Amino acid sequence: MMNKEITKPNEQNILVGIDVGSTTTKIVALDADHDHQLLFSDYARHHANQIASVIKSIKEFCSHIKQKKIRLCLTGSGAKPVSSILKVPFVQEVAANAIALQDKFQKVGTAIELGGQDAKMIFF
């Protein structure tokens, strides 16, 4: 199952996040200069080949968006070894979710995330 969305960027500052889960790889690119406008997203099953899946996602992103100022980070249950091999920053997924939720929803009290291998609950 794949889901892609692509729009054209207006600026060079792009935030790219890749979530490597137990069964899928998700990538999203946001315009950091224009209210985090969605520029690119993709979702694909990795069939237990996380590194190849991440590389494919990055190549797909780069084929659509040719920018120089890209900030990239990996998260997810399968991302730590991939980040080490590719020398890309890693943020633990519960921490990443907590930071994003508190930034977007200042009054959030509880968050529940259902993943492919586990479920997580965050209390603020």
Language-model segment annotations:
Residues 1-10:
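A short, basic/flexible loop-to-alpha-helix module at the beginning of a structural domain
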Residues 14-53:
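Short glycine-rich, Thr/Ser-proximal phosphate-binding strand/loop in the N-terminal lobe
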Residues 15-19, 71-73, 109-112:
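Short glycine-aspartate micro-motif
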Residues 83-124:
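Phosphate-binding/catalytic loop of phosphoryl-transfer enzymes
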Residues 50-64:
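Short, well-ordered amphipathic alpha-helical segments that serve as non-catalytic structural scaffolds
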Residues 55-59, 79, 98-102:
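Predominant activation on well-ordered alpha-helical scaffold segments within soluble catalytic domains
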Residues 43-46, 61-95, 123:
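Short beta-strand-loop/turn "lid" adjacent to the catalytic site in phosphate-handling enzymes
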Residues 18-23, 76-77, 114-118:
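A short acidic Gly-Thr/Ser loop motif
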